[in-house]
Amino acid sequence: MSAVTQEATAVPRTLQEVVFVDGVRTPFGKAGEKGIYAQTRADDLVIKCMRELLRRHPELPKERVEEVAIAATTQIGDQGLTLGRLAGLLAGLPKTTPGYSVDRMCAGAMTAVTNVASSIGFGAVDVAIAGGVEHMGRHPMGEGIDPNPRIIGERIVDESALVMGKTAENLHDRFPHLTKERCDAYAVNSQRKLAAAYAAGK
């Protein structure tokens, strides 16, 4: 018998460049029965945005869109099921275009964007649509949920952690010096640093 040796083949780890092409959103509106979206379904808000995005880019064949990721915190009623898939179909994408939902507090849409960006980066897809919806007028935060009582009873988290509005109030009370003006100035400075880094080729 002879010994057989195999040389390990190094697979190059290269990432594709990811480009954010365009963004669409609905106008702000007030919640409640008198709000401009009171009679509008949450999924229809997403569909309107997707249709507008596709209208703006006639150079992009719809079949080139290989993934749709849509986030919603309160996944109930017209924000339930698989928003990415259903909204994609109703927006006119082919039946072959897959989609999914992201359920995450406060950063769901951002997570949807980073998820598809990662997929593009390592070559799983070339073109994707990502975003989020939260129809507070139709689905107030916490509607239909039933958190396990042990979360509070065993003091795993403070009760205020279940309501983002309360968290915002706590932050204001603990850090009153973090005014909107200071936060805006910080954001502007961050963008300037980014522009300088790009200009320097970093």
What are the language-model segments listed below?
Residues T73-Q75:
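Short histidine/acidic/glycine/proline-rich micro-motifs that form metal-
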